């Protein structure tokens, strides 16, 4: 786990970012990829390195879960078990290389007063009702027992509905831009060049 960066506005009792990097990346390989999607190059750095750089820039504590678990639920449970004293958790799939540090901090700040925080991105010109759920999803310490009991591929959907969850609007297309296929990687490359 990384320590906090004192130059950032870190929320009191900051949650730990759980970077989930356990997946096999089969869709990426099936789409023509020649390496694991997290090792694919995007603007001269790997997809994983972009995600790590954003997390490090946020100043929040973090943990990478890359042990090769069979499902997302198993990965989340393992990561929470390795960070038992965290004030909460931001669950961030490692294949979101365009996520912005400010988004991580925005979710962390909102988590201070809520059990679960669901970031949502609204595309330009769209109404808030058309918001797309994104990442990272924030979970307060109150969710710990349920997160530790997760398994399989469903992730934390069951935990989300068991607690009071709020939606927040984030101004970050990176919160919904994951890399699952070679086409996704090409789209991310175009978006990265436009920054």
Identify the residue ranges that each predicted region occupies.
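N-terminal nucleotide-binding beta1-loop-alpha1 segment
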Residues: 1-30
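Short glycine-rich anion-binding loops that position phosphate/pyrophosphate groups of nucleotides
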Residues: 23-26, 69, 94-97
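Short alpha-helical oligomerization interface
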Residues: 33-41
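Short aromatic/basic micro-patch
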Residues: 41, 98, 138, 178-179
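A short, N-terminal amphipathic alpha-helix
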Residues: 45-64, 78-82
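Short beta->alpha junction loops
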Residues: 64-70, 173-174
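Conserved beta-loop-beta/alpha segment of the NTase-like Rossmann-fold superfamily
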Residues: 72-148
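Active-site oxyanion/phosphate-handling segment shared across diverse enzymes
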Residues: 143-195
């Amino acid at each position: 786990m990384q320590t906090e960066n004192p130059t950032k506005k870190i929320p009191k009792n900051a949650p730990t970012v759980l970077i989930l990097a356990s997946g096999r990346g089969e869709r990426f390989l099936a789409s023509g990829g020649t390496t694991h999607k997290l090792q694919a190059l995007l603007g001269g750095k790997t997809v994983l390195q972009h995600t790590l750089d954003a997390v490090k820039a946020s100043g929040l504590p973090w943990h990478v879960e890359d042990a090769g678990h069979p499902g997302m639920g198993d990965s989340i449970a393992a990561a929470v078990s390795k960070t038992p004293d965290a004030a909460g958790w931001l669950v961030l799939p490692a294949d979101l290389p365009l996520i912005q540090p400010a988004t991580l901090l925005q979710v962390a700040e909102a988590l201070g007063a809520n059990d679960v925080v669901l970031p949502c991105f609204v595309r330009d010109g769209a109404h808030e009702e058309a918001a797309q759920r994104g990442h990272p999803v924030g979970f307060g310490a109150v969710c710990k027992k349920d997160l530790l009991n997760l398994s399989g591929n469903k992730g934390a959907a069951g935990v989300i509905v068991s607690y009071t969850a709020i939606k927040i609007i984030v101004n970050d297309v990176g919160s919904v831009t994951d890399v699952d296929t070679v086409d996704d990687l090409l789209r991310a490359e175009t978006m990265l060049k436009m920054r």
